[in-house]
């Protein structure tokens, strides 16, 4: 349990820069998600007794999501590689609803925007729960941390 481990949190998050940059909107989402994640998170690699704080590098390679975890001083802690297959549908649906949302905020009624946003939040929650389940036994995260990590997974997809 993260409460028993000192400094079970992230102090730095980096996305694989080799994928390249995306649109200003996506880059803004990335920056906000990283800021929010660093400000408040619960993150503990299972089996690590020394505790954090931790640095995380997220990258994509051959349809796999790679979590490279080090201590604040750079010492390696763990690398976890997850298949993206369980997340593909929800990420695809999330992209589609985000596109609808961005179009709606330009011309739709407030009630239509609110309805689309509720659907977007629901899909975001679903993706967060799926990611949290995929990390179980590897990295302990709370739901809010999983939500912010899911946002970053989506940013990697947008860029990749």
UniProtKB/Swiss-Prot annotation:
<comment type="similarity">
    <text>Belongs to the UPF0262 family.</text>
</comment>
<dbReference type="InterPro" id="IPR008321">
    <property type="entry name" value="UCP032146"/>
</dbReference>
<dbReference type="Pfam" id="PF06793">
    <property type="entry name" value="UPF0262"/>
</dbReference>
<protein>
    <recommendedName>
        <fullName>UPF0262 protein BCAN_A0255</fullName>
    </recommendedName>
</protein>
């Amino acid at each position: 349990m993260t409460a028993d481990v000192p400094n079970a949190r992230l102090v730095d998050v980096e996305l694989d820069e080799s994928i390249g940059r995306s649109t200003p909107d996506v880059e803004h989402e990335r920056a906000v998600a990283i800021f929010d994640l660093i400000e408040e998170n619960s993150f503990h690699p299972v089996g690590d007794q020394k505790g954090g704080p931790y640095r995380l590098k997220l990258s994509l390679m051959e349809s796999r999501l790679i979590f490279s975890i080090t201590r604040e001083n750079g010492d390696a802690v763990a690398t976890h590689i997850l298949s993206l297959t369980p997340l593909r549908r929800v990420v695809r649906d999330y992209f589609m609803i985000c596109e609808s949302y961005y179009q709606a905020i330009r011309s739709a009624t407030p009630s239509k925007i609110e309805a689309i946003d509720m659907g977007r939040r629901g899909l975001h929650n679903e993706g967060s729960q799926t990611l949290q389940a995929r990390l179980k036994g590897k990295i302990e995260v709370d739901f809010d941390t999983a939500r912010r990590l899911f946002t970053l997974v989506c940013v990697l997809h947008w860029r990749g």
